[in-house]
Amino acid sequence: MAANEKTFGGAISEARKAKGWALKDLASRVLREDKEAISLQYLNDIEHDRRSPSSDRMVQQFADVLGIDRDWLYYLAGRFPEDVRDKKLSEKQVAEAMVAFRGGPRKGKGRS
């Protein structure tokens, strides 16, 4: 990955710092499935790209709390949002969507 490419953790860290928050300030606002705040170590691991968010709900919380576009965070996390996954697309529809996302047709028809 090039040095100028943003990662999920990098985006979270940058947004947190822009708000002037310490790790504990953000960690207290993002809840696990059991409704407890995430740990400082877990957040630190996420910010340093050693761990990924454990659920869609957590990606959404980071987006909402930090004011980051949800789709951008899903992209950085390497995930598709639930509403996209629920579409039950065919192989052809997915291929066409990926071509559009990439900005044009791929060379050759094989998988890359």
What name fits each language-model region?
Residues 1-21, 25, 71:
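A short, Lys/Arg-rich alpha-helix, primarily the initiator
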Residues 13, 27, 39-40, 44, ...:
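Key DNA-contacting residues within the recognition helix of helix-turn-helix
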Residues 18, 29, 65:
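Residues within the alpha-helical elements of helix-turn-helix
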Residues 20, 37, 48-64:
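Short, basic-rich loop-to-helix N-cap that marks the start of a DNA-contacting helix
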Residues 25-32, 62:
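Short alpha-helical "recognition helix" segments of helix-turn-helix
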Residues 31-53, 78:
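Recognition helix of helix-turn-helix/homeodomain-like DNA-binding domains
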Residues 54-56, 60, 64-84:
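Short C-terminal boundary/hinge segments that cap the last helix of small helical domains
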Residues 77-112:
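Interfacial/linker helices and their anchor residues that mediate assembly or domain coupling
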